[in-house]
């Protein structure tokens, strides 16, 4: 049960980091195009 809980937390953390990275990448691309 603990392993499953850790796995879920790790999955959500990975998704959060991926989402933030995607937003940063999109913003960086937008800045390059705007500039």
Swiss-Prot record:
Entry annotated with the keyword Cell membrane: yes
Transmembrane segments annotated in the record for this chain: 6-26
Gene Ontology cellular component list: plasma membrane
Domain of life of the organism encoding this protein: Bacteria
Membrane topology reported for the UniProt record: Single-pass membrane protein
Presence of the UniProt keyword Membrane in the record: yes
Primary subcellular site in the record, as a coarse category: membrane
Keywords, alphabetical: Cell inner membrane, Cell membrane, Membrane, Stress response, Transmembrane, Transmembrane helix
Compartmental location: Cell inner membrane
Induction of synthesis: Constitutively expressed (at protein level).
Similarity remark: Belongs to the UPF0387 family.
Protein name: UPF0387 membrane protein YohO
């Amino acid at each position: 049960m603990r392993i499953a809980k850790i796995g879920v937390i790790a999955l959500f953390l990975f998704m959060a980091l991926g989402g933030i990275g995607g937003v940063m990448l999109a913003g960086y691309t937008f800045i390059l195009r705007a500039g």
